Amino acid sequence: MFRLDNLLERWTEIYAPMQHNPSATAKPEEKAFFLIDRWADQNEFQRTFNLLHKPSLCYCTTIEAQIAPKANPKQIIYQYNWYLACKQRSTGNPLADDEGARNAKLDLNDMMIDLLAFLFTLKGYVRGRTLPKDCPDAVRDIADSLSAEDRQGIDGLRLDETQWWSAPVYKNGWWLLGVELEGLDPRQLCIVPTRYI
């Protein structure tokens, strides 16, 4: 199965504002990628956000899916959800709080656009387009290391239908941007004989 969470974690590692450290021994403040069940549930981000000083991506691991209508053979569409989070810059001036809140939301929107550009670039690459000449080496490395399963999964992402929205302030100046994206599972819906007795 295509794992979008693995691809997004790799993006957080190479994206300069985040620079996620994926090591199991990383300090909480070195992390910028978190797996969560749902935002409303207690999770690692919520337990450590007061130690964080950089934007983060919180990927929801709950599974939402449906059968693709009119697909023959039958396929499954998955709904992927995640949150981008960033802390409002403190000005020390309560009168500037509204401007700081606006800037935090605009920063999140810029990060989302950067992430979409990354995903669109990879989708074009798996469809045979060459990477842009000014494409960062880290993005090239990811593109060149994609497995066949990753390539099919990226090709099935419905990037043109991506939706995102800003949410009210979470806590202590942390703002959220919720994201929804659908993807067509490249596997056909069929019986796998080895899974039966």
Which residue ranges define each predicted feature?
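Short linear interaction motif-like sites in intrinsically disordered regions of transcription factors
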Residues: 12, 40, 83, 165-166, ...
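Oligomerization/assembly interface segments of phage tail-like spikes and tubes
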Residues: 74-91, 169-187
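Acidic-leaning, charged glycine-interspersed low-complexity segments
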Residues: 104-184
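Mixed-charge, glycine-accented linear interaction segment located at domain edges/termini
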Residues: 186-195
